[in-house]
Amino acid sequence: MLSNLHAVMDKAEAYAEERKFSPDNYVAMRLAPDMLPFSFQIQSSTDRAKLFLSRVSGVAAPTWADTEKTWAEVKARLETGLDFARSVPAAQLDGTEDKLIPLKVRGEEVQWPAQKYLLENALPNFFFHVTTAYDILRHAGVPVGKRDFTG
């Protein structure tokens, strides 16, 4: 999904270029006044992916400052997230379905099996932020559709 989001960002960049405006305009866009901007959606998407992969595989997660303010910085953040995801060996995830993962869920300390963490926390949060990023760009007029989202 992060690679699909990257492709959507490529289309957004091309759309901005065709229309002669800076893709930096997308960075602060939001769907509603009380929602967080596009930059936050990319930060959260990459955070959800890295935290799941790190917690389950044991591979140390990179730290990111969440200071991206330009299109280039936001895109670089997504690329860094993709690089980390690709670097985690699949073998370190195999057989971890029952591994207990300590989490804080709604302010409560819990230990969930990795499969429950994936299905009830990591994926829903990840898809929420990826979808919101897509929706912000779509709302801005970027000509993308379901196939762009799903790949």
Language-model features and meaning:
Residues 1-47:
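N-terminal structural module
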Residues 3-6, 43, 72-79, 83, ...:
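Generic structural signal for well-ordered, non-transmembrane alpha-helical segments
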Residues 5, 9-12, 49-52, 81, ...:
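Hydrophobic alpha-helical packing residues
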Residues 17-27, 87-118, 150:
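Acidic interhelical loop/turn segments
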Residues 28-61, 109-144:
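Short, contiguous alpha-helical
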Residues 50-88:
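Helix-adjacent hinge/juxtasegments
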Residues 144-151:
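Short, highly charged C-terminal tails/helix-capping segments
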